[in-house]
């Protein structure tokens, strides 16, 4: 099985990066530094996103990822993100908030989808699980926007993530910040920052299914680099 990448040009008819830049420009012209509730999946993906957005937003960085297992892996990723926020210089220092960790939330969501290939419906439901919790928390806290770091990954479907975010905006009445953070060399910059800060870079997304798929690819000599 070959690796599937969502580079943007093939999947996205809208340019979410340009939409984000327009929002940033409008807020800057108005002299606003909006409050952003940012769902973070891991330190490497968050590195560039935090570097970029902290120039324009006051960020609460929300680590809610019940998909990650085992617990030791979850703890390791949590610590790395906390360390990154402590060590990186920021114009507006992000606040770190850890969500609850209950893997049963993920397994209940994935029920019946255990054999669906990576990048399919199970992943889309996982996107929604995490984004919905972020939207709820953002609405409860009176934030101006919510979004996720997930769109930085070449393995994640940015169009689907933005569509889910826009659906949740209508439900929870808090603005979704459009993004495709892999654009403008965002993913490349995240790898540079990961090296600079010596970040732990995991080789699977987080769930048992992605771990199993990664191990199968390794055994067959098929890796995504």
Question: What label would you give each PLM region?
Answer:
Residues 2-225:
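Nucleotide-activated chemistry modules centered on ATP-dependent adenylation/adenylyltransferase
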């Amino acid at each position: 099985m070959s690796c599937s990448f969502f580079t943007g040009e093939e999947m996205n008819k809208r340019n979410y990066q340009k939409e984000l830049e327009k929002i940033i420009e409008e807020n800057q012209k108005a002299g606003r530094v909006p409050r952003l509730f940012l769902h973070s999946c891991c330190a490497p993906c968050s590195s560039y996103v935090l570097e970029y957005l902290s120039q324009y937003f006051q960020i609460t960085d929300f680590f809610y990822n019940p998909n990650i297992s085992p617990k030791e892996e979850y703890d390791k990723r949590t610590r790395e993100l906390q360390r990154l926020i402590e060590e990186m210089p920021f114009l507006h220092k992000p606040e770190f908030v850890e969500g609850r960790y209950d893997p049963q939330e993920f397994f209940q969501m994935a029920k019946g989808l255990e054999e669906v290939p990576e990048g399919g419906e199970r992943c889309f439901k996982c996107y929604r699980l995490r984004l919905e919790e972020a939207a709820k928390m953002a609405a409860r806290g009176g934030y101006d926007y919510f979004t996720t770091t997930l769109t930085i990954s070449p393995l994640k479907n940015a169009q689907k993530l933005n569509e889910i975010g826009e659906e949740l905006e209508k439900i929870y009445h808090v603005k979704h910040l459009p993004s495709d953070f892999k654009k403008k060399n965002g993913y490349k910059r995240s790898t540079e920052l990961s090296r600079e800060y010596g970040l732990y870079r995991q080789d699977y997304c987080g769930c048992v299914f992605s771990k199993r798929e990664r191990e199968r690819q390794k055994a067959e000599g098929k890796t995504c680099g």
